[in-house]
Each structure stands twice: as structure tokens, then as C-alpha cells.
Swiss-Prot record:
GO BP terms in the entry: proteolysis
The organism's taxonomic lineage, starting at the top: Eukaryota, Sar, Alveolata, Apicomplexa, Aconoidasida
Described function: Cysteine protease that cleaves specifically after arginine or lysine residues.
Pfam families in the cross-refs: C2, Peptidase_C14
Family to which this protein belongs: Belongs to the peptidase C14B family.
Any one GO molecular-function label of the UniProt entry: cysteine-type endopeptidase activity
Entry's Gene Ontology cellular component terms: cytoplasm
Recorded name of the encoding gene: MCA1
Name the record gives this protein: Metacaspase-1
Source superkingdom: Eukaryota
């Protein structure tokens, strides 16, 4: 079901720079549907625009989710782009963005811009959003009723607030500058965003009031031009009575918890706000943000599953709510080579958004580093040198309470083991994009750069999407899915930190436009994810598209734990291995090799 829309109504308010000494001239550019819209140029450190744009929407029934870009430019002899952000059409359609101070993605300067972005059909819609901006404390229905009865903003405001003092007001601009408006009506919005870095700004660049996914990357799946990752999930993945339309219009419940609100006490493993499901106010979600549009009253059903994780039996050493939270994401498609893959870059991009939107990773180059081989900047291509440097960056200066995430999607090979440590005589490797000239990265080097520097009280979660990768981080224990028990691996290294590794390999028939982690972490319908649920879901999902040989999912860990442990980025297990590592096996292997 598609909603007919006429125009995107954009209002540009105040531009602020983190550097208060900024005095250059700046303007705002908006790009939509191959057209450019530009604001006036402001200078002297005062950047109050108060400009509106009515941008027509074409190709309403086009399947791809179009993107509107908003950029900040410095006006000079050579104009320079300072910062940018963008929104999907789907997010604008569903979520109201009314005078939000949005932090832009930094190019040259850090800045925030007050924005209102909504979909309108007629003049009454425009009046509604203007009044909503002026009188944020009033309910939507109150404003709608007033708009229907009046033709201008002053009359609407008069009816709503019932003030005799505005009888003589004929211009709404005069009213906004009046004492009554400034003292009575203009109430600043409460800042509900909590940033782990300690810095507090007015709002994230994705406004907390926006319920839909807001993409900051353009990526294309195989065979389609899609940039809305929610809509790429097949209907068959949902319960038969919960269709795609119901899901898309209620996906906001996944993201309705503000940053930082998902932290709980160590003993509270039964409920967690980060794992919102469709039971949470599903019938109260608006169909769209156009107040005067007709909409079908589709019946929305509840989806529920009586599945809760058991309380953690292990002792928690640290509970992270303010320490470092960093991620390294590597996606390699080996574009233009005989070894070309499809979907690895896409997986890295979508995983980046999952970390930001659901697990509250801060969207900054200081917190998330993404290496993909279609990157034009050579410093962000997944070469061997860049990968090793990125591994060092990820875990450097780690301290108890820090949380790290590592994702790799690409090829893996086997290489002869000259050290005689590996059981089968071969090292597992990951394959950089320049492997033909620089070679692969073996598992021992991965362990040296990524695992060995980690201290007790640090947590690392890793997802490895490549064949035969179960032992690629050389962790001590492997979980046997059929026997439902842990087994010690051959000659493991001793690891102090709380490290877990999910290893799997998608087949060629697996749809490249569908991200596996997206399905497991976003489209799940239980209150809290557990490690047991994770491995069962990944295993089932991969083999859903495999008609020949079943693929396996491996869960590796630096220590044993209750498999019903909740999967999150907060709780960290205390090291339970005083000694782990069997050097005698190295000697034994060498003796057998000589024979």
C-alpha cells in the first residue's frame, strides 16, 4: 500500500557551529531528485535562516526509497562543503521532524541545524506543521480541529491559547517576537540524548523523534536499487498475520528508546528496553505524519513469544555504560576480480546502522571504522596494511568496561602452518583486497592484533562471515549446537577478556539484498535476545536458502558461559580461566610431523 504525497515541506532554522568563533558566510543546500535547492547566504556568525522549501515528489510508486540530502556550505572564493546529513523518503513519510536541532556528519566543521521536514498535501497540512512548531505542547488533534475551523495562523493560535492580547496581531512574525510567545509558549525541548563520549549536544543528527530508519549511506543490493533496509526483508520472515505494511508502520518501536536508556542493573536480565518488540504500543503508532490525509484502518495484530532468557548464573565483573564503545567493520566484494563476491559491502554498511540505531554506538569516525573496497579514499580500503592498523586502533588503550565489535565479510583461505601449532597443519586466513601482492592475514596475526591486547573486564563481540572460519580467532571453547555443550578447542590461547565469535558462511543463493544480522537483530519478535536464540536463528536463516548441503553456525568463546545469557553490549563476564593453553600439543605435533 502506497500513500500518495505531493510535496516535502522543509523549513530551515538556525545553524550553529561547535566553534563559537566561526564568522564566515554559510548557506544550506538541499538535493532531491537530481535538483538543487539553495538558501540565502548568512554571515557574521549569525545563521538564522527561517526559510521554507516546498519540494515536489515524483515517482510515488517507485520501489526504491529516495533520499533527500541537506548540506552546509561555506561561501568563499572556492565554496567548501562543511557538513551534511540525509533522510530517506520513507522516514519522512512516517516520522514528524519538527524544529529538531540535528547534528550533521562532519566534513570540515561540526555543526547543528534546526530542521523541520514533513510531507504535505495541501495548505492545511502546512498550517498544521507551522502551528505544531509554534505550540509544541498542544495535542495533534487539538491543532487539527483548530486548523479546520480557521484559515490563518493567528486565528488558530487565538483559538488554541485563548489570549485576548493577540486580537491586534495581523502578522505571525510579530507574534513570535512578542513577550507572550517568548515567555508562555516557546518552551525548549528536553534533551533526552545521552552520549558515551561525555559530550552533550542538543540532539543526534538522527532526531530522536524520527521513528523510522534514517540511512546515512547509499548502497545497492544485487538486482535492485534499494536504500531502505527495513523493506528488503521478505514477507515470509514475518508471522502470516503480520504483513509488511504493518511492520513498516510500526518499526519505530525498535528505536523508541533514547540513547543510553537501555542500561539495566546486573541482576535485571528479565527485561531490557533495548529489545523493544511489536507488543509495545503497536496499535498506537500513526500510519503516517500527514494529519489531513485519509488512511485505511488496517487491523494490526500482536506478535508475542513466551521466550525469556534465564538469569545470568555467571558473575558480572563490569557493567559498561560510559566506557569506550568502538567497532571495526570490514566488507570486501573484490570488485572486478575473478573472486568477486556480492553483498559483503552491503552487509558492512547495514551492520554499521544496526550498531548506531539499536545498540547506541556513537556515529563518529572515532567510534566506528568501516573498511570497504569500493571506497575511493585509499586510507579506508581493506588492504592488508589498513586492516592491521585498524585492528590496532580498535583495541588500543583498552580498559575494563570497554566494549568492542569486529565484523568481517569476505573470502578466507588456508595457508600452510610452518610453526606446527595448528591441528590440521594449516592456518586460517582472511583475504584483504590487495592479497595478490601483499598476501593474506593469518589467524595467528588476527589473534595477536585483536585478542591478545585485551584486558580482563573488556568485551569483544565478533561476527565472521566467511567459510571455515570457526577457529580464526583462536579462542578456547566451541559450542556444540546438537549436543548443547561447550568443548575445549585444540591448543587454545589463554584469553583474559570476554570474547565471543559468531562464524558462518552464506551460500551463493543467499539473497545479497538481505542482511543476516539485520534479520536476527532487528526483525526478531522476542523481548530479549539470547546467545542460544542467536545461533539457532542464524543457522535456520542460512539454511533456508540452502537446498543441498547444510551450512553450520559456530559460536566460539574465550570462556564457557550459560548459553541462555542475554546478548547485549553491556554486561561483561569475569575471566574464569586461570590457565588455558596447552603448549605440550605443539611439541606433540612436531614429533608426529617428524615421524
Amino acid at each position: 500500500m502506497s500513500l500518495q504525497m505531493d510535496k516535502i515541506y522543509v523549513k530551515v532554522h538556525e545553524l550553529k557551529f561547535v566553534n563559537n568563533l566561526e564568522r564566515n558566510s554559510h548557506y544550506v543546500k538541499i538535493y532531491w531528485d537530481d535538483k538543487k535547492y539553495k538558501s540565502q547566504t548568512k554571515d557574521g556568525g549569525c545563521y538564522i535562516f527561517n526559510e521554507t522549501f516546498l519540494i515536489p515528489i515524483t515517482n510515488i510508486y517507485d520501489q526504491k526509497d529516495q533520499i533527500i540530502y541537506v548540506e552546509i556550505w561555506e561561501s568563499n572564493l572556492l565554496n567548501k562543503q562543511c557538513a551534511y546529513t540525509f533522510f530517506t523518503l520513507n522516514s519522512i513519510k512516517i516520522g514528524q521532524i519538527i524544529k529538531e536541532n540535528i547534528t550533521f556528519i562532519e566534513v570540515l566543521k561540526k555543526c547543528t541545524l534546526g530542521l523541520s521536514i514533513n510531507i504535505v498535501r495541501n495548505q492545511k497540512d502546512i498550517l498544521f506543521f507551522n502551528i505544531k512548531e509554534l505550540l509544541p505542547t498542544f495535542q495533534d488533534q487539538e491543532i487539527i480541529n483548530a486548523v479546520w475551523k480557521n484559515e490563518d495562523e493567528a486565528s488558530i493560535i487565538k483559538q488554541l491559547i485563548n489570549l485576548n492580547t493577540i486580537d491586534g496581531i495581523t502578522n505571525i512574525g510579530n507574534y513570535k517576537n512578542s513577550q507572550n510567545y517568548n515567555e508562555t509558549l516557546q518552551k525548549p525541548k528536553e534533551n533526552i540524548s545521552i552520549y558515551k563520549s561525555g559530550e552533550e549536544i542538543e540532539n543526534s543528527y538522527i532526531p530522536s523523534s524520527t521513528p523510522e530508519y534514517v540511512s546515512h549511506y547509499i548502497y545497492k543490493g544485487a538486482g535492485e536499487n534499494s536504500s531502505n533496509y527495513i523493506n528488503k526483508t521478505k514477507d515470509t520472515l514475518f508471522p502470516t498475520y503480520l504483513n509488511n505494511y504493518a511492520y513498516n508502520n510500526n518499526i519505530k518501536n525498535v528505536y523508541d528508546t533514547p540513547n543510553g536508556a537501555h542500561y539495566s542493573s546486573n541482576n535485571n536480565s528479565g527485561s531490557n528496553n533495548a529489545y523493544s518488540n511489536f507488543d509495545h504500543n503497536i496499535n498506537n503508532s500513526p500510519k503516517n505524519n500527514v494529519p489531513f490525509s485519509n488512511s485505511d484502518n488496517d487491523k494490526i495484530f500482536h506478535y508475542s513469544r513466551n521466550y525469556m532468557p534465564s538469569p545470568n548464573s555467571e558473575k558480572m565483573l563490569y557493567f559498561s555504560c560510559g566506557n569506550k564503545k568502538k567497532a571495526l567493520l570490514i566488507g570486501i566484494d573484490y570488485c572486478g576480480t575473478q573472486n568477486e563476491l556480492k553483498g559483503s559491502i552491503n552487509d558492512a554498511i547495514i551492520t554499521n546502522e544496526l550498531l548506531i540505531k539499536k545498540y547506541n554506538f556513537y556515529d563518529s569516525s572515532m567510534n566506528i571504522l568501516k573498511l570497504i573496497d569500493n571506497q575511493t579514499n585509499p586510507n579506508y580500503r581493506p588492504t592488508k596494511r589498513n586492516i592491521l592498523s585498524a585492528l590496532e586502533w580498535l583495541v588500543q588503550d583498552n580498559n575494563p568496561g570497554d566494549i568492542f565489535f569486529f565484523f568481517y565479510s569476505g573470502h578466507s583461505y588456508k595457508k600452510y602452518d610452518y610453526t606446527c601449532i595448528e591441528k590440521g597443519g594449516y592456518n586460517q586466513t582472511i583475504v584483504p583486497c590487495d592479497f595478490k601482492t601483499e598476501g593474506e592475514i593469518i589467524d595467528n596475526d588476527l589473534h595477536k592484533y585483536l585478542i591478545q591486547p585485551l584486558k580482563d573486564g573488556v568485551k569483544l563481540v565478533s561476527f565472521i562471515d566467511c567459510p571455515n572460519s570457526e577457529g580464526i580467532l583462536n579462542l578456547g571453547y566451541k559450542y556444540k549446537l546438537k549436543k548443547e555443550k561447550w568443548k575445549e578447542t585444540y591448543n587454545p590461547f589463554h584469553v583474559l577478556a570476554d570474547v565471543t565469535q559468531f562464524s558462518y558462511s552464506k551460500i551463493n543463493e543467499f539473497p545479497t539484498e538481505i542482511n543476516l544480522l539485520e534479520h536476527v537483530l532487528i526483525t526478531n519478535n522476542i523481548e530479549a535476545l539470547t546467545y542460544h536464540y542467536m545461533i539457532q536463528s542464524i543457522h535456520s536463516y542460512i539454511n533456508l536458502y540452502n537446498k543441498k548441503k547444510k551450512k553450520k553456525i559456530f559460536l566460539m568463546s574465550s570462556q564457557k558461559f550459560n548459553i541462555d545469557r542475554k546478548f547485549d553490549f553491556n554486561h561483561i563476564l569475569k575471566n574464569s580461566n586461570s590457565e588455558l593453553g596447552q603448549q605440550k600439543n605443539i611439541i606433540k605435533w612436531k614429533k608426529n610431523k617428524k615421524k
